[in-house]
């Protein structure tokens, strides 16, 4: 396993954590809140964003304009059943989601959720590190690389691990500030 591959895997983990953070509601309208919603459409699970145009006309509203008006009921149902905690209102052409201000208790819950997602990302990075170091030690035992090369590679993997974990911690700090800002 090459160092570049390890860093690439770690970067993908950071990006995945960032996407997970984007789905956490902060009190401001953000179309990415609906990224994980799938709609039962003609018997198939279809992502909401492929069935409608999603926009944020103001800081507290998300507007969803379905390409096919017959899908409005299914979209409303999917949003109601999802974990976003928003109630859709339908005017016949557009589905609107009003984002209520977050209570302090809800903000604390969201900070805990963000911390949990960050921890999952850090665990994934540590697992990548463990796999990489195991592969390096295996190559050393097989006499493919020297003990010094093995130690150098392990140090590089550890430095990469520290760097990517710090990135996740920075993302978490930013998200926590975002959530706690009224």
UniProtKB/Swiss-Prot annotation:
Cellular location(s): Cytoplasm
InterPro entries for the chain? Ribosome_recyc_fac, Ribosome_recyc_fac_dom, RRF_sf
Assigned keywords, A-Z: Cytoplasm, Protein biosynthesis
* Principal place of residence: cytoplasm
- GO terms (BP aspect): translational termination
The answer on whether this UniProt entry bears the keyword Protein biosynthesis reads yes
Q: Which domain of life is it from?
A: Bacteria
Checking SUPFAM superfamilies in the record gives: Ribosome recycling factor, RRF (SSF55194)
Q: Please name the CDD domains in this protein's record.
A: RRF
Which GO cellular component does the record give, naming just one? cytoplasm
Name the protein family. Belongs to the RRF family.
Q: Which PANTHER family match?
A: MITOCHONDRIAL RIBOSOME RECYCLING FACTOR PSEUDO 1 (PTHR20982:SF3), RIBOSOME RECYCLING FACTOR (PTHR20982)
What this protein is reported to do is described as: Responsible for the release of ribosomes from messenger RNA at the termination of protein biosynthesis. May increase the efficiency of translation by recycling ribosomes from one round of translation to another.
Record protein name field:
Ribosome-recycling factor
Which species is the source of this protein? Microcystis aeruginosa (strain NIES-843 / IAM M-2473)
Q: Which gene encodes it?
A: frr
